[in-house]
């Protein structure tokens, strides 16, 4: 039996380098905040994935197949709760600290009371007026999408098609539907679950990432921990890189022609003299129907 100094709770509390996590025992794993239609569909799929018992976690390729996670322990202490709230504000709001009047105190109280999970808290912060004022109304469409990915999934968009799909979703169903789709996605569920605050995950070799993910996240200011995303401008930081990658993917593959030696064909020629036309073989005269001669 583990002692107090070596218990799971003590070990987790001592690990400060890992992601911030907090477990709500009463309703862990359930979304208890209002969802849009897109969010309801994503939530339905998420519950089916959860029922399958698939391993959770970011799936570090360097650990496969030696480390497979089927469950994850999250602390439920007051210190863990405080750490989660601070980390969520920093991550979701792009390192832009709100004032006391701008904080979502109602969400904080519900999280403290165990009424919502960390996932719901993150979802609520991304739908707040403070977030919309800084990362929706004040920026361009592609800039807003790339910040949504950075804040909620811990990565930059992988390609231009991913950006276009989410811009279309936002235009057709609204901003809240976009947020629900991201926080209720299978990717969010697998990597962060219901208890972990999103974090930058492009520094390691995670499953599904490509080699330019690190550079795209660097363009988004992922390495600038002392600068807020709001201070880095309103224009997209990844539009040129994604456009170049899109052009490269659609460029036709080079090929070479192989020369073929052509052999000239000489047809035999009929030669005759005088007025005698050469006789034709196998000639059948045409006879109209009913005429005989």
Curated annotation (Swiss-Prot):
Contains one covalently linked phycourobilin chromophore. Keywords: Antenna complex, Bile pigment, Chromophore, Electron transport, Membrane, Photosynthesis, Phycobilisome, Thylakoid, Transport. Its main location: membrane. One of its GO terms (biological process) is photosynthesis. InterPro entries: PBS_linker_dom (IPR001297), PBS_linker_sf (IPR038255), Phycobilisome (IPR016470). Signal peptide: none annotated. It is a peripheral membrane protein. Gene3D superfamilies: Phycobilisome linker domain (1.10.3130.20). Residues 50-229 form the PBS-linker domain. It holds the Pfam family PBS_linker_poly. The keyword Ribosomal protein does not apply. GO terms for cellular component: phycobilisome; plasma membrane-derived thylakoid membrane. Phycourobilin binds at residue 49. The keyword Electron transport applies. It is found in: Cellular thylakoid membrane. This protein is a bile pigment-bearing rod linker polypeptide that associates with C-phycoerythrin. This is Phycoerythrin class 2 subunit gamma, linker polypeptide. The lineage of its organism: Bacteria, Bacillati, Cyanobacteriota, Cyanophyceae, Synechococcales.
């Amino acid at each position: 039996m583990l002692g107090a100094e070596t218990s799971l709770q003590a070990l987790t509390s001592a690990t400060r380098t890992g992601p911030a996590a907090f477990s709500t025992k009463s309703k862990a794993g359930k979304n208890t905040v209002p969802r849009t239609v897109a969010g309801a569909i994503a939530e339905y799929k998420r519950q089916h994935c959860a029922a399958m018992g698939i391993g959770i976690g970011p799936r570090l390729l360097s650990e496969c197949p030696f480390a497979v996670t089927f469950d994850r322990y999250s602390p439920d202490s007051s210190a863990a709760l405080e750490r989660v709230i601070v980390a969520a504000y920093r991550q979701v709001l792009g390192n832009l600290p709100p004032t006391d009047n701008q904080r979502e105190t109602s969400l904080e109280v519900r999280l403290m009371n165990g009424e919502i999970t960390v996932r719901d808290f993150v979802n609520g912060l991304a739908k707040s007026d403070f977030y919309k004022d800084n990362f929706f109304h004040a920026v361009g469409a592609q800039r807003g999408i790339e910040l949504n990915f950075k804040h909620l999934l811990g990565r930059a968009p992988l390609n231009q098609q991913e950006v276009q799909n989410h811009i279309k979703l936002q235009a057709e169903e609204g901003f809240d539907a976009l947020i629900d789709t991201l926080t209720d996605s299978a990717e969010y569920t697998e990597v962060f679950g219901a208890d972990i605050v999103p974090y930058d995950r492009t520094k390691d070799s995670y499953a599904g990432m490509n080699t330019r993910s690190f550079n795209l996240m660097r363009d988004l200011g992922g390495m600038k921990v002392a600068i807020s995303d709001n201070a880095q401008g309103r224009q997209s930081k990844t539009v040129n890189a994604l456009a170049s990658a899109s052009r490269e993917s659609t460029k036709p593959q080079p090929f070479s022609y192989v020369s073929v030696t052509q052999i000239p064909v000489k047809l035999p020629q009929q030669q005759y003299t005088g007025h005698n036309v050469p006789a034709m073989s196998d000639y059948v005269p045409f006879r109209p129907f009913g005429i005989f001669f």
